[in-house]
Amino acid sequence: MLDIQFIREHTDIVKESQRKRGESVELVDEVLSSDTARREALKAFEEARAQQKEIGKKVASAPADEKAKLIAETKELSQKVSEYKSKADSAAEEYTTAMWKLSNIVEPEAPEGGEDDYVVVKKVGQIRDFAAEGFEPKDHLTLGTGVAGIDMRRGVKVGGSRFYFLRGQVARMQIAMLTMAVDQAEEHGFTLAITPTLVRPEVMRGTGFLNSHADEIYRLREPDDQYLVGTSEVALAGMHENEILDLGNGPLRYCGWSSCYRREAGAAGKDTSGIIRVHQFDKVEMFVYAKQEDSYKEHEHLLAMEQEMLAKVEVPYRIIDTAAGDLGSSAARKFDCEAWVPTQGRYRELTSTSNCTEYQARRLNIRERMEDGGTRPVSTLNGTLATTRWLVAIMENHQQKDGSIEIPQAMRAYMGGKEVIEPTKWEA
């Protein structure tokens, strides 16, 4: 949610942000109109109620010949107060509905355009020349099946399309990767949290995921109304809902480990083979509560954390500055780290980090205590440190001619010193 005072004073900035996102500019006028109607209705209600109370005080001490008249006026005002209250409530509801539709204000530095209009910030690592090595690279599913590590057939049998089993050393590789991510986060002062994967509608709504991404989310309606999270960002944001935080000693930094669920609505025909686009996966997510003036520095820190982790798994990658039209409603700016996938001949997203400024905090009523005793909304930021999809890039970039997979040096200590995952015969 945005600050209504900012919208009133900087209407052009908010409209320009909506335009850059490709969203409704007229919605800003709707918000301002409903704000005016809300304030006028509230003023009328409060004036009528004050008048009602004033007359009520006079009734007790009024002469007998005036009491009947005052009582009649009180009854008439009581009806008006009730009507004004109803109008004020209705106006407030319309205002809130309009306000919650508005997306966060895009940072001026974010590129204009849509999904394909990102700006490449930098590229890191050398892309392998498999032709020079004398063999054609195998895709991650072929490799995973060959080492008895990915079982799509039985995953589909059990859960339906886009489900899978990770087995044996590939399952161990995922655990190693996630554990390595947690260790790195803790070394940088993050607190580990195993988070709920079911959340209340108020929390999901507060994080902004029910705006443009509602069709991606699994909802359990009966007998409870809850949502399955697509990232532990949701639970970590809701953890301090309706709280006043002490950020005097610096930001609060968490890393959440959770299973995640996504419907992948609209993904028909995309990445139907393997584990790039699936309904269930595991992820370590960083989440930060910071002072407003510290959010940009924290965003840089999260991006640096992601790069440190990518260096450990030794895959070529690039960083892109996501265009405004491709941002989620909560994000003011977002950077993606995309790894090179040899068999696809292109970069694929592995991580993203977003600065949500005060947008989520206003919706979830999360504030910080100021030195003067007052409060103000905090900034929230998030960034992925490791997830199941990373296995795709690791396996394909570290494959050997015989179908084995070399384990990145930094991960070997997490896999009992194992250096290579060898092909295995099994009933796939």
Curated annotation (Swiss-Prot):
NCBIfam families referenced in this protein's UniProt entry, alphabetically: serS
Function: Catalyzes the attachment of serine to tRNA(Ser). Is also able to aminoacylate tRNA(Sec) with serine, to form the misacylated tRNA L-seryl-tRNA(Sec), which will be further converted into selenocysteinyl-tRNA(Sec).
GO cellular component: cytoplasm
UniProt enzyme class: ligase
Name by which UniProt lists this protein: Serine--tRNA ligase
Recorded name of the encoding gene: serS
Catalytic activity from the UniProt record: tRNA(Ser) + L-serine + ATP = L-seryl-tRNA(Ser) + AMP + diphosphate + H(+); tRNA(Sec) + L-serine + ATP = L-seryl-tRNA(Sec) + AMP + diphosphate + H(+)
Originating species: Bifidobacterium longum (strain DJO10A)
Binding site for ATP: R262, R263, E264, V278, E349, L350, T351, S352
Lineage of the species this protein comes from: Bacteria, Bacillati, Actinomycetota, Actinomycetes, Bifidobacteriales
HAMAP family cross-referenced by the UniProt entry: Ser_tRNA_synth_type1
Matching PROSITE patterns: AA_TRNA_LIGASE_II
